Amino acid sequence: MDVLELLRASATGCYNTIFSEAWHQYVHKQIAAAVYWYGALFLLGVLLFVWFLYFKRLARLRLRDEIARSLSAVTSAATGVDHRGLRFRKRDKMLFYGRRMLRKMKNVSGQMYSSGKGYKRRAVMRFARRILQLQRENRPLEMKTVEPPAEYLEETIEGSDRVPPDALYMLQSIRIFGHFEKPIFLKLCKHTQILQLMAGDYLFKITDPDDSVYIVQSGMINVYICNADGSTLSLKTVRKGESVTSLLSFIDVLSGNSSYYKTVTAKAIEKSVVIRLPMQAFEEVFDENPDVMIRVIQVIMIRLQRVLFTALRNYLGLNAELVQNHMRNKNSSNPMATGQTTSNVQSQTSQATQSRPSGTTRTPTSPMLRLSREEHTLSDPDPNPNANNLHYHEMHGDAPYIDLYHYQQQQQSLNSPRRNSTAHVSEAAAASTASSPTTIDQRLVQSSAVDSLRRELGLGEEDAHIIEQFVLVRELEPNVTLITEGNADDVCIWFVMTGNLAVYQSNADATRASAKQDAKPEMLIHFVHPGEIVGGLAMLTGEASAYTIRSRNNSRVAFIRRAAIYQIMRQRPRIVLGLGNGVVRRLSPLVRQCDYALDWIFLESGRAVYRQDESSDSTYIVLSGRMRSVITQPNGKKEIVGEYGKGDLVGIVEMITETSRTTTVMAVRDSELAKLPEGLFNAIKLRYPIVVTRLISFLSHRFLGSMQTRGSNAYGTPVEANPVTHKYSTVALVPITDDVPLTPFTYELYHSLCAIGPVLRLTSEVVGKQLGVNIFDTANEYRLTSWLAQQEDRNIITLYQCDSSLSPWTQRCMRQADVILIVGLGERSHLVGKFEREIDKLAMRTQKELVLLYPETTNAKPANTLSWLNARPWVTKHHHVLCVKRIFTRKSQYRINDLYSRVLLSEPNMHSDFSRLARWLTGNSIGLVLGGGGARGAAHIGMLKAIQEAGIPIDMVGGVSIGALMGALWCSERNITTVTQKAREWSKKMTKWFLQLLDLTYPITSMFSGREFNKTIHDTFGDVTIEDLWIPYFTLTTDITASCHRIHTNGSLWRFVRSSMSLSGYMPPLCDPQDGHLLLDGGYVNNLPGHLWRYCRASMSIAGVFPPFCDYRDGHLLLDGCYTNNVPADVMHNLGAAHIIAIDVGSQDDTDLTNYGDDLSGWWLLYKKWNPFTSPVKVPDLPDIQSRLAYVSCVRQLEEVKNSDYCEYIRPPIDKYKTLAFGSFDEIRDVGYVFGKNYFDTMAKAGRLGRFNQWFNKEPPKRGNHASLNEYTFIDLAQIVCKLPETYVRLGTPDLFSEDEDEDFDGYISEPTTLNTDRRRIQVHRAGNSLSFSEAELDSDVELDLEMENKVDKATQSTPTLPDKRSVQTPTPSLFNLTMPIAVDEIDKSSGRVKRKLEATNTASIAEPEASPSIKAEATTQTTPPTSKRTEQDEHELEHEQVVEKQQVMDKQQGNTTNNDTKN
């Protein structure tokens, strides 16, 4: 059998060999014969052609010779002279040949345009070009690729050579105390001492006095903590130029309290030189300059709140650990709250009952107490079940009743000198409560409160008359809110007389913990017991309250409002020490230890925080400003890794992993940072292990975020790196020319930004009127920067409108800006002006973006954008903005303000270009990604219509393959009807098969030449560039030259769309003319992601069908982007989109394949295929396997996109349609529309559509949460002490800081506000009490507030809510929520006149000041008497005001000049 098999095999092989050889011989013979015949015929034709030319030329020569001979014979016969012997002269020869040559040149030039050899040559070249498909070199305009300047990626190394090093270090160290003038700085330098330390010497030890500031001039100092068991732990290492000090100890020393080192020790690591500055040196300066003392205390409190509390609370999760529940070494200044035993309390009670006058009773009631009781419901449980337990009150330090009769007898002898001054106050208190009997004498309560607060403020008994008229006493029921977190109106100094107050703070993890059932939005920080004070931190910083304060049980509190404290401060500046000392006493030892370790760093633009390859021993928190992280590659090239904004943590991963710095981080603009050393982290971790959990959670979120964006990075970046974010906090707006309507543009942008969150618009006029005309001087730099920093903290974004010249305000805007918007008119010249170049030199590191404005009346599309960008290489991004007609209307400043006072009342159009720009600046852009799928891409049109009907704005568009075509149509037209029409026309062209047959070519690279396909795309878009599209757009292609995907955001549109559709095998790759790379369909690597049509064509270069498209910029060959990424949602996310809708129309591979075992026979597959009686099998063929291999990376990328949290993945049901079914355009479009409409309706019902179409808050703004310029204005306490003149004089308010200062303004000065303002005060400013404006006031931005107030809605008013005794989450009644009628102006729409109506609003003051006579007269003529009844509390307040006014009149008559011009 083996022999037979061998014979059969040999015979088969022999026959096969014979047959193949015979066939090859026959073919070769036929080809050889054909070649011979064709060669012979070709040679014969050549010979005939040559012979014809030769014969023609020979005949021409013979004819010429015959004519010459004939003429010569005739001439000789006529003259009788034989010319054969004559010769011409040389001059005649030269003339003859010269004329002949000129005649020939003329004939040659004529042949170039008529006929002859030139015409034939051109015809042959045209024929050859058409046959060989040669193309002329016709490259379009390209974007110039310019490297950023060295300053953009490099730090500033230049130093201050003019200042000695020791003076420079000292100047930087004491900068934490604020800005000092040169004379004051020189006085401090006189007290400095130089300390020489050897290695191992102690700088200070435990029990040494903590009364100095130490500045390291050279060497290194180690600061460590000594534990109770004798072990030590390094806290931080102080290097050259750094300092060691505690600002909290600084307050102790100034307050006269001795401070000693208890747990902190400093030792020299090496030989060091240290500068010692005693804290007592500041005493001399402060005595001569009280304003400097107040400013230093304010800076210390601001640092405590912004640095210490921010770092420990927000990043380490420490809240209650920062304060101590019982103040240490607290000598209670409240004689009502002294700790007494139960027997003592009972004995005092019995003695008081026997010796109390008979007219008194035992039931404590007051109007406030009755009001609080009425607000509670009967069903509420008792919040304090132990309220009647005397032992309970003894243990908690809050006695329910303590007799004041004996206290009155004791205080009569002490208070006799000031009895007369307090008589009227006591009589007012008694008169206010005469209607209801009470046990506790109100006069004694008032006197006790005044005495207690006087001691807390550090005032003597002789100063009691200063504060007694400002002290108010209230009785509270449980769960009454005194002030809420973030409230700047009701800031007071609260002193607890009886009962307890609970201090809460919002939970930093409330957002992530909201999914948990036990999550609490607030955390209990500490309790305030009788004899303790609270509210000093917000009072000294001038900012809003950082805590929410509620009464824990029935309590009695005494308080002084913020305006009153500032008036007292003008007379007694040293009360800031008492307030600061009260804040310091409340802090825990942990905060004091952290105060030694934490540093507050100020960095100018260009200065480096740390450099690459340095040791990482600390991390940094960005308090304000912007940082840029730059990595230096081994070849020396620098690249941006990320940028950090306000609140970001920098360098945390490197510090924890103990690795060297991987990047260099430098300040883009002037910035403030908090430095947290590694030793502090270790010390806190040992004491509070919960910090480790917080850090793990923080690092996990950062690691997951980097994993989602790592796939699209060209190079590996550390986990620490933060991708370049497009969320800015400050934006500067600069006009290119004077005719740019910058003010209307700023208003429109402000209008759109207001829908996202609190925003502020600042101009030079606004800042000048708020802070003074000299605020831009160098001496006022601290005040200006502090004020601007506070405005940035209170708003999500701040708009800095620059002047049209390089003024000091413009320079300040450049220093404060995170990004600069250069605004120009798109239809004007693109030339760069001198002012614009100065702006670039002034802020070289700041990112700049170009904004081109177009009027909507011209219907013109953007054009020539490349010229704008090439002229400005410093621009990193551009925006096309279509503007309404009102922006380009020429009006005066007042008319513009009046116009936008009405515009700002309306809801912004979320689909406008201004809203798109607003979302980009705030990091809320919505991106649309369209995947590839051939004819199934018609579903994109239906989905676009469904998206438009769902109200979802589209800010960015990216596409691959057919998605690149549809996305480019939408970005170009932005009209669903026009987009549908053009897409349908293009699909019809794709169904004309006779044109495709003419495009067939020899299939070496592809089946089609791609010429007709290019023509269809070019006819659709024309010569449009990607830069000229209305909406930012990108397409993705597969670069087969560099074996990667390429993202095209600029260049020829049709070319890169064509390259993204170059499917392998159908079209040749597109060759990038810039670098010669071959580009294929981008879907091979990423199926969801210049002239416009070129990149569209490149994105549609299907390999094998159409040839790859050659990029005209670099020569790379481009293919369809579907080979790399068919749904490039990750690319869209990296480009700045926060929310993405990804639509996938690609085909799905069959994964249900047959398991055929270890081997596979093709004959078996053939048998299964052709035998109808067997079960079919699913085995991929060779083309299918190649296709699956090509799409491997695309499938992996698609799965990552589906699992991401930033993308909404949508796939319409279009699987039944084939890739080339372009004839079913309308049917596929309808399928996509119906599916999209149902999909978005389902999302809307489920509440998941809000992040796409409800990015703004539709609720009317409320007083409690709306930010206004005056509400968050920076309060410079030093200015109060100096009694500087007012910047903006207010008639009718004699004092700069009146008690009702917070009610003077309730809106931005720069733009209209939706809050109510006391219109009566404003009318005093006008001539004749009118609200109209004179022509001299047309350029005032402040008038915008006044116009806005006329159109305020009653919805802005809030009403008090009933408290919940148990739940903290339920809104609780506020102490200031007292409904009182006030007069509000309203405009009659029919007549346009101002009317006065009576509304009920929540007053923010306890005692509303009485109106001035002029105001009363105005109110009498325009108001109607209130119909509501006054409450007993209102009567009490009015009577109290009358008593105070009588006292003031008597004091004036007696010559007593106390502070009589204030209002209580």
Curated annotation (Swiss-Prot):
Name of the gene: sws
Residues exposed to the Lumenal side: 1-34
Its taxonomic placement starts with: Eukaryota, Metazoa, Ecdysozoa, Arthropoda, Hexapoda
Can you provide one Gene Ontology molecular function annotated for this UniProt record? lysophospholipase activity
Report the top EC class in one word.
hydrolase
Biological process annotations from GO = glial cell apoptotic process; lipid catabolic process; membrane lipid metabolic process; membrane organization; nervous system development; neuron apoptotic process; phosphatidylcholine metabolic process
Q: Which UniProt keywords apply?
A: Developmental protein, Endoplasmic reticulum, Hydrolase, Lipid degradation, Lipid metabolism, Membrane, Neurogenesis, Phosphoprotein, Transmembrane, Transmembrane helix
The listed location of motif GXSXG is 959-963
Q: Motif GXGXXG: which ranges?
A: 932-937
- Tell me, in a sentence or two, what this protein's role is: Phospholipase B that deacylates intracellular phosphatidylcholine (PtdCho), generating glycerophosphocholine (GroPtdCho). This deacylation occurs at both sn-2 and sn-1 positions of PtdCho. Its specific chemical modification by certain organophosphorus (OP) compounds leads to distal axonopathy. Plays a role in the signaling mechanism between neurons and glia that regulates glia wrapping during development of the adult brain. Essential for membrane lipid homeostasis and cell survival in both neurons and glia of the adult brain.
In the record, Phosphoserine modifications are located at: S421, S1175
Motif annotated as DGA/G, chain positions: 1081-1083
Record-annotated residues binding a nucleoside 3',5'-cyclic phosphate 3? 575-702
Regions of compositional bias (Low complexity) in chain numbering: 338-367, 422-438
CDD domains (alphabetical):
CAP_ED (cd00038), Pat_PNPLA6_PNPLA7 (cd07225)
Native source species: Drosophila grimshawi
Q: Name one GO cellular component term.
A: endoplasmic reticulum membrane
Q: Which Gene3D superfamilies match?
A: Cytosolic phospholipase A2 catalytic domain, Jelly Rolls
The protein depicted here goes by the name Neuropathy target esterase sws
